């Protein structure tokens, strides 16, 4: 009787393990759908960033927003409205035109690549000149809200950290 009970329990355990292994295998197959793509998501976004000519209009817009803080223009606060804040020495019309070009560039990106390419564009703008922490914050804050302003619904806003860390004086 003990042998029969052991045999039944062993059979159930084997069935459970086989079922669990096949479920796991199925999950892996669904999760690894992009495994057939030799280019991972990071390389794909990097390639899109290069093909979109590094989001030139968006970089120009970030530079405009960064310069606004220097000349006493409107500053960025928690209620960030890029469309209202755009100022350009050549006139507000050109500022809105650059915003529209930037939105067009972002709409050409894959939704999963919008934030990574905006991060690369913001990094490029930050590295192009001698910027203090407040200008860098303004660059990243502009990049953070651009998908929302451009009404890219799949993205909303990018999860960039826009706070400036405190550095104690030495």
Swiss-Prot record:
One of its GO terms (molecular function) is nutrient reservoir activity. Keywords: Disulfide bond, Seed storage protein, Signal, Storage protein. The keyword Nucleus does not apply. Coiled coil: none annotated. Residues 22-37, 73-88 form a propeptide. InterPro entries: Bifun_inhib/LTP/seed_sf (IPR036312), Bifunc_inhib/LTP/seed_store (IPR016140), Napin/2SS/CON (IPR000617). PANTHER family: 2S SEED STORAGE PROTEIN 1-RELATED. This is a 2S seed storage protein. The mature protein consists of a small and a large chain linked by disulfide bonds. This is 2S seed storage protein 2. It comes from Arabidopsis thaliana.
């Amino acid at each position: 009787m003990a042998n029969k009970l052991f045999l039944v329990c062993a059979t159930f355990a084997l069935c459970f393990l086989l079922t669990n292994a096949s479920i796991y295998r199925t999950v892996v197959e669904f999760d690894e759908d992009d495994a057939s793509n030799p280019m991972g998501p990071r390389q794909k976004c990097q390639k899109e960033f290069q093909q979109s000519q590094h989001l030139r209009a968006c970089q120009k817009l970030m530079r405009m927003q960064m310069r606004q803080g220097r000349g006493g223009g409107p500053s960025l606060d928690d209620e960030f409205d890029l469309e209202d804040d755009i100022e350009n020495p050549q006139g507000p019309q050109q500022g809105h035109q650059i915003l529209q070009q930037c939105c067009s560039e972002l709409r050409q990106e894959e939704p999963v690549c919008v934030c990574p390419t905006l991060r690369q564009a913001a990094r490029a703008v930050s590295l192009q000149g001698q910027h203090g922490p407040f200008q860098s914050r303004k660059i990243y804050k502009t990049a953070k809200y651009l998908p929302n302003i451009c009404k890219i619904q799949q993205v909303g806003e990018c999860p960039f950290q826009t706070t400036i860390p405190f550095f104690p004086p030495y």
